[in-house]
């Protein structure tokens, strides 16, 4: 948004796309493994900003398709978000499974994800809900905690290993699911 305020919307869109083109060059030269984070505002904006954000997002998906790499999305979490991301992926010709929804709610079923790959913050409640749905098609992550009352709060990088160790210790999650969530899925996306 501040780019659009500073340079105008058209120039801001050009700057964002140019940044992704640079990232694509880094990927092609072996210095990166994915396009992103790319996305849309997760707060109300004017339609012209929303449309420009979707054009930038579409270009990121096109670059990901050209390079056969994932694109990491940071955007809103509405009921139709994953469906709209899946539709953009289809438009770009990108496999929906290469669209990684960063900071995803625990939406893990095919009906919820529409083929998009959820990456879920590793909170106890998120993990419990995701696992209760009977699938292990998701990744777990750490991030800033999106709480206006705690603007600098983070989920430490040690959170994921601690959660996984607890799963192993209490037998809460089958080892094959742990391998899928923590190794097989990330490897399939980032070691193509």
Each model region followed by its residue ranges:
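His/Asp/Glu-enriched short active-site or ligand-binding loop at hydrolase and phosphoryl-transfer sites
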Residues: 105-106, 114-128, 144-146
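Glycine-enriched alpha-helix->loop->beta-strand junction motifs that scaffold or abut catalytic
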Residues: 67-70, 91-96, 111-119, 134-139
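Divalent metal-binding pocket/active-site signature
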Residues: 5-107
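Short acidic/histidine-rich active-site segments
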Residues: 74, 136-154
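Short, charged, surface-exposed secondary-structure boundary motifs
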Residues: 109-112, 127-134, 149-154
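Active-site gating loops and adjacent loop-to-helix segments of metal-dependent hydrolytic enzymes
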Residues: 1-12, 30-31, 145, 154-167
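Active-site-adjacent beta->alpha loops and helix N-cap segments on the catalytic face
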Residues: 51, 80-83, 126-135
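Mid-to-C-terminal alpha-helical segments outside catalytic/metal-binding sites
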Residues: 161-192
């Amino acid at each position: 948004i501040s780019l659009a305020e500073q340079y105008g919307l058209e120039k801001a869109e050009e700057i964002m796309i140019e940044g992704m083109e640079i990232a694509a060059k880094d990927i092609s030269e072996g210095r990166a493994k994915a396009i992103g984070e790319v996305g849309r505002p997760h707060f109300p904006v004017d339609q012209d900003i929303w449309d420009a954000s979707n054009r930038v997002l579409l270009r990121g998906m096109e670059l990901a398709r050209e390079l056969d790499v994932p694109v990491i999305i940071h955007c809103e979490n509405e009921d139709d978000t994953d469906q709209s991301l899946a539709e953009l992926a289809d438009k770009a010709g990108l496999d929906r499974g290469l669209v990684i929804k960063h900071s995803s709610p625990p939406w893990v079923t095919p009906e919820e994800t529409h083929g998009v790959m959820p990456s879920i913050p590793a909170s106890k409640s998120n993990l419990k809900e995701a696992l209760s749905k009977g699938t292990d098609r998701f990744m777990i992550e750490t991030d800033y905690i999106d709480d206006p009352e705690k603007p600098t709060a983070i989920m430490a990088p040690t959170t994921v290993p601690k959660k996984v160790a607890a799963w192993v210790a209490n037998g809460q999650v089958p080892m094959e699911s742990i391998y899928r969530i923590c190794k097989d899925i990330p490897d399939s996306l980032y070691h193509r």
